[in-house]
Amino acid sequence: MRRWAWAAVVVLLGPQLVLLGGVGARREAQRTQQPGQRADPPNATASASSREGLPEAPKPSQASGPEFSDAHMTWLNFVRRPDDGALRKRCGSRDKKPRDLFGPPGPPGAEVTAETLLHEFQELLKEATERRFSGLLDPLLPQGAGLRLVGEAFHCRLQGPRRVDKRTLVELHGFQAPAAQGAFLRGSGLSLASGRFTAPVSGIFQFSASLHVDHSELQGKARLRARDVVCVLICIESLCQRHTCLEAVSGLESNSRVFTLQVQGLLQLQAGQYASVFVDNGSGAVLTIQAGSSFSGLLLGT
């Protein structure tokens, strides 16, 4: 009977005794540990290796999935790669590049000075002026024409000789348009019979006259005087003294029987005004203007 009682006690108190034994063994292990030491946490090794720069690869949990495992292993392989001196040298040389330069990548461009900027500005101003001037002329030019159209121009010759008495002023008339190639008569401003060119519009005109003067009557006579001269004039409205005129003066001391007297220049005419050629004989003998003497004019612009 007593045996059965002890057996029942052992069955009931056995688990409690085993638990008390485990607790006692743990306390004994803590007593035997040195005072300066402390137990490392389970992840102490991983933390130390991460502080050294080479983290250990913890085992990925099974619930992370294959994608997370592959990415994690790739990162660890990159961190644990061998020390490549060439790669480090290349990266180091890249860091040594100057960082104080602004602008797009590449070698620096040429230095731009104030003189260069001024020259470029002058070129731009010149181009703008040419474009503006071309735009002003476009309405006056026919489509597709690259040259300026001359609206009024003429070249005519004296049809016959013209006698000029001494001390007289004579207006030349009786011109004709030459039939030879090269002569021209453009516009309707010239009257060949009267020898007058009437301006169709107000503008600046260029005129010229080339007269062949015959002074054969003076040869063999008394010595020429200082006032024995001949003048060729191109006058406006036949008023040579009131308006501006083109004038050429020549003496009569030439040894030849005939000499040529020329005059040319620019005159501004208003619409309706005319210009013509005059000969002023200041000598004491009769002069003759030979046939073939020419008179020409051209409208330069308005």
UniProtKB/Swiss-Prot annotation:
UniProt site (Cleavage): 97-98
One GO biological-process annotation of the entry reads: negative regulation of gluconeogenesis
User: What are the alphabetically sorted keywords of the record?
Assistant: Disulfide bond, Glycoprotein, Hormone, Secreted, Signal
Q: Which GO terms describe its cellular component?
A: extracellular region; extracellular space
**Does Glycoprotein count among this protein's keywords?**
yes
Q: List all Basic and acidic residues biased stretches.
A: 86-100
Found, by tissue, as follows:
Predominantly expressed by adipose tissues.
Q: What does this protein do?
A: Insulin-sensitizing adipocyte-secreted protein (adipokine) that regulates glucose metabolism in liver and adipose tissue. Promotes glucose uptake in adipocytes and suppresses de novo glucose production in hepatocytes via the PI3K-Akt signaling pathway. Administration lead to reduction of blood glucose. Able to attenuate inflammation in fat tissue.
What is the scientific name of the source organism?
A: Homo sapiens (Human)
Question: C1q domain spans which residues?
Answer: 147-302
For region Disordered, the annotated ranges are: 28-68, 86-110
Q: What induces it?
A: By insulin in subcutaneous adipose tissue.
Tell me what this protein is called. Answer: Adipolin
Question: Signal peptide location in the record?
Answer: 1-20
| PTM entry text | Processed into Adipolin fC1QTNF12 and Adipolin gC1QTNF12 by FURIN. Insulin enhances endogenous C1QTNF12 cleavage.
* One Gene Ontology term of the molecular function aspect: hormone activity
Question: What domain of life does the UniProt record list for this protein's source?
Answer: Eukaryota
What is the similarity comment for this entry?
Belongs to the adipolin/erythroferrone family.
- Say yes or no: keyword Disulfide bond present: yes
Subunit and interaction comment: Homomultimer; disulfide-linked. May interact with ERFE.
Residues of this chain annotated as glycosylated in UniProt: 43
